[in-house]
Amino acid sequence: MASGGKKRRSRTAIIVSAIVAAVVVGGGAAVFAWVNRTPENTVPKARSATIEHPLTPAEQIVADAGDPRACAVTFTGEGAPADPMLQFQDALYQGLPIPQLEGRVFAGWYASADGAGAFDVAARVNGADPVVCTDQQVELFAAWKSPEENAAEDVRVPILMYHQFTANPDGEKGWLRGNYAYIGDFDEQMNHIATTGFYLPTWDELSAFIDGRLSLPAKSVIITDDDADQTWFDLAVPVIDKYKLLSTSFMITAARQDPAPSIYVQRRSHTHDMHQAGDNGKGRMVNWTADQIAADLTTSAQILGVGQVVAYPYGHYNDTTKQGVAQAGYEMGRTIEPGYVMIGTDKLALPVVRIDYGMGLDALISRIG
């Protein structure tokens, strides 16, 4: 029995080994066959296509500008332009539109809808403000008033007129002593304007205000200097820069053609070469023909790059002057006559608030609030 059992176990082992070997060989053959199979004709899986979204108009003008300072300004509200406007950061706003609607008076652009609804002067944006953008875009909101509201406000805009400046508290000597504002007084005056809620209109805005097309805040003021004397550059402009106040330098372009010393200084014309007296002691503005005046002012505008407003030398002007100014394409002329700009003021005879030596902060407040 034992001998027979051993034989059976031996045969069984041989059979099992044979089966295992067959399985191994067969499995290996199967693996070999799968690895070396002929690939089937399969349909490749579709890949997700890249979808290109078109740029918005605001994104497009920024892309076209190719400048990291570029900023697309979009406008919201009744009468707002549909197209965005290109501006540049590190500069002041330029040429913001003044829309028109029948029977309405535009009341400005604001940084928020709430600001527009409240006519918040602190939120109002114009060419006195630096361009500030987020992701190279900014949105401005329109506000409107009725003509009756605008007229009832009875806004009067002072145009401040400075000439030369002195660092001497006791002033300068000589017959032009009154022209030299003490720079300490000037600093206090500019600080007052900067910190008490004044609005600084552009000349475009002043023109629209005179027409009754634009409402200006009650506390509006325009800062100007005549002659572009070196003391303006050395003493006054640093103060203008410190307080970030829009100002105008009326330049005699035959005498000097300096570039604007600050983004807050607009160069405008004090004529090219008419700041000289004729034989009768009066300025060329009232001695020359309209054609001669227009030719001089055209030269000045070409040098300055703008022919918008002129300050009359010595304040002299007449109807011939006005004709020459209009022929040259200027909109406005500034006199030395005292007064305030109101709706309907003669654009070619703008009055001023003259600031002389000895007029401190109290004198300014008594004149402009």
Describe the function of each predicted region.
Residues G66-P68, Q100-L101, V132-Q136, K145-S146, ...:
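Extracellular/periplasmic catalytic domains that process cell-envelope and extracellular macromolecules
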Residues S17, A22-W34:
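Hydrophobic alpha-helical membrane-insertion segments, chiefly the h-region
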Residues Y110, D114-K219, G358-G369:
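N-terminal pre-catalytic segment of deacetylase/amide-hydrolase enzymes
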Residues N41-A107, A111-S146:
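Secondary-structure capping and domain/repeat boundary segments
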Residues A29-K45:
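Sec-dependent signal peptide cleavage junction
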Residues E337-S366:
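A cross-kingdom marker for long, charged
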Residues V155-A181, L216-V221, D229-T231, L235-V237, ...:
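Metal-dependent polysaccharide deacetylase catalytic core of the NodB/CE4 family, i.e.
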